[in-house]
Amino acid sequence: MTIRLVIVEPEGAYNLGFIARLVKNFLIDEFYVVNPKCDINEAIKFSAKGSEVIEKMMKITNNFDDAIRDVDLKIATSSIADIKGDLLRKSIRPIDLERLIKDKKVAFIFGRESVGLTREEIAKSDFLLFIPANPEYPVLNLSHAVGIVLYELWRNRDNKVPTVSSEPIKLIDDYSKKITDILVNKEATKSMYLVLKRVLIKGIEDNEEAMTIVRILRKIYVRLAKKENESDKLL
């Protein structure tokens, strides 16, 4: 398992410093910061032993897509989740992570202190992670939220769970997109695709199940594509 931590436009130097320390605490593999809005030198003052993380390990980019490239799964985080009728906000919990990320390269994405991640940024992710808290005050400090997630990853790192390789996951992603492109009107395609992909991937226990799902999706796609081509010829 390889973990990449992505922080988008951090606004507080203290939070960035505390997060750098957490990166060292929990042996995170990669640390990306997108378009930081705070003073990096100021952040170093808050990082203690994590100063070398900022100075040597942290990668700064101005492009969100660059920060989430070349990973198997992208997991966004938000304190706003499971809003009725909002498919984009359907979430998973920290307890779901163990099985989903085993033996994969995963990016965990945290947003701005003020407004979090945009809907566009969440839509580019595979899952939305929500940390349950007091419903009347669910918003956690950025560095605290990062700490909770990284602790969960550390706690489960040596547990033996069935693994699903990245290749069938990519195929499920691909066929889910192709099927929804055919079946659903363009306005609803993105939401339906995300829901289909999330439900399928979340429910898979091992590679055998994953490949069974891939075969089913492939057959569905081939039949749908054939019917669509036949319909086009009649026009």
Swiss-Prot record:
Effect of residue 11 to S: No change in activity
Taxonomy, superkingdom: Archaea
Result after altering residue 45 to E: Decrease in activity
Gene Ontology molecular functions: RNA binding; tRNA (cytidine(32)/uridine(32)-2'-O)-methyltransferase activity
Major location (coarse): cytoplasm
Reactions mediated catalytically: cytidine(32) in tRNA + S-adenosyl-L-methionine = 2'-O-methylcytidine(32) in tRNA + S-adenosyl-L-homocysteine + H(+)
Annotated effect of mutating residue 137 to F: Strong decrease in activity
Effect on the protein of changing residue 139 to S: No change in activity
Keyword Methyltransferase: yes
Keywords: Cytoplasm, Methyltransferase, S-adenosyl-L-methionine, Transferase, tRNA processing
A Pfam family this chain is assigned to: SpoU_methylase
EC class (word): transferase
GO (cellular component) term, any one: cytosol
Annotated consequence of substituting residue 89 to E: Loss of activity
EC number: 2.1.1.-
Keyword tRNA processing belongs to the record: yes
Annotated effect of mutating residue 47 to L: Decrease in activity
Binding sites annotated in the UniProt record for S-adenosyl-L-methionine: 77-79, 111, 131, 138-140
Signal peptide start and end residues: none
Family, as annotated: Belongs to the class IV-like SAM-binding methyltransferase superfamily. RNA methyltransferase TrmH family.
Subunit-level organization: Homodimer.
Role description: Catalyzes the formation of 2'O-methylated cytidine (Cm32) at position 32 in tRNA. Is specific for cytidine.
PANTHER family listed in its UniProt record: TRNA (CYTIDINE_URIDINE-2'-O-)-METHYLTRANSFERASE TRMJ, TRNA/RRNA METHYLTRANSFERASE
UniProt name for this protein: tRNA (cytidine-2'-O-)-methyltransferase TrmJ
Phylogenetic placement of the source organism: Archaea, Thermoproteota, Thermoprotei, Sulfolobales, Sulfolobaceae
Recorded name of the encoding gene: trmJ
